[in-house]
Regions:
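Class I S-adenosyl-L-methionine-dependent methyltransferase catalytic core
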Residues: 1-167
Length: 167
């Protein structure tokens, strides 16, 4: 996940799903953004213009969850897409425990261990990398956009329920 993607259609439906899950199970859901600074990925990443699917803000999707919809409206402004600010202010913190530390290639293991400690009280953790599950473990910059298989195994060994989308 990158700040610039915050508030796109994927976030809208992800937040609806996590809020619903939290309410039905009567427990907070962990959300590990797999937050990445695009500068760490290189110049080509900085020049991408993907993640701009915000047409849902112009139609009647607001009826699904008006609170989430109103919070997403702010992110039409690119400059306001700051995950840390969002997680401090959103009503969703009642339902979701957000892990906001940025992952880096050189400190990935330390970052992951911090996430494990952070989610010690959550039974269910939603993993939100840019590109889904890696085919193999790697320490490359590009691997920051993926969940590593070893990370999933570790969470499972701790009896966590892991949810993520494969792209």
């Amino acid at each position: 996940m990158q700040d610039r993607y915050l508030g796109d259609v994927h976030d809208f439906y992800k937040f609806i799903f996590l809020k619903y899950l939290s309410k039905k199970l009567k427990q907070k859901i962990g959300l590990n953004w797999y937050l990445v600074d695009p500068k760490e990925l290189g110049v080509s990443e900085l020049n991408k213009n993907d993640g701009e699917n915000r047409k849902f803000l112009k139609n009647k999707t607001s009826i699904v969850d008006t609170k989430i919809f109103k919070e997403m409206l702010v992110f039409r402004d690119y400059k306001k897409r700051i995950i840390e600010n969002f997680t401090e202010r959103t009503h969703l913190k009642e339902y979701i425990n957000f892990f906001n530390l940025k992952v880096s290639a050189s400190q990935r293991l330390d970052w992951f261990n911090k996430s494990v400690n952070f989610f010690s009280d959550e039974k269910i953790i939603f993993l939100d990398p840019d590109n889904g599950l890696a085919k193999r473990n790697s320490s490359s910059r590009e691997s920051l956009k993926y969940v590593m298989i070893e990370e999933v195994k570790k969470y499972i060994s701790l009896r966590k329920i892991i949810v993520f989308m494969i792209s």
